[in-house]
Regions:
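Compact soluble domain cores
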Residues: 1-73
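Short, compact, well-ordered microdomains
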Residues: 64, 69-120
Length: 120
């Protein structure tokens, strides 16, 4: 089940963006794959199109976006090569005053990882 993109979400709420080492290696093999992954992030995920996740995940994602309270978001997409990727954001919209920065960094609370499902 997919959602229809509406307006672009606040990119700063997605935090630091990184890739799993396996996906990074896969993208290194073909520039077009890297561009496809970036395109999914920029043109789908950042617009609230969560791809092929279940309806309960869509509901949780939309709730996290609506509340901007540090919720988690998951998107799932199939690349043109047939490989499935996940994009997972931890702490969407968490505010700095909600963070314990004595023990952790902002990146610990708020980050987005693009990966293969088996990397999770």
């Amino acid at each position: 089940m997919t959602t229809t993109p509406t307006k672009k979400l606040n990119e700063s709420n997605f935090g630091f963006i990184h890739y799993s080492s396996a996906l990074s290696h896969y993208m290194d093999q073909d520039f077009n794959i890297a561009m496809e992954v970036f395109g999914i992030l920029e043109n789908k995920y950042f617009f609230g199109n969560w791809g092929i996740v279940e309806s309960d995940s869509i509901q949780m994602n939309n709730e996290a976006v609506k509340n901007e309270n540090g919720g988690d978001i998951l998107g799932a997409y199939i690349l043109s090569t047939g490989k499935k990727i996940w994009i997972k954001t931890v702490g969407y919209g968490i505010k700095e005053n909600q963070m314990d920065l004595k023990e952790y960094t902002k990146e610990d609370y708020n980050n987005t990882c693009i990966m293969f499902p088996e990397d999770y």
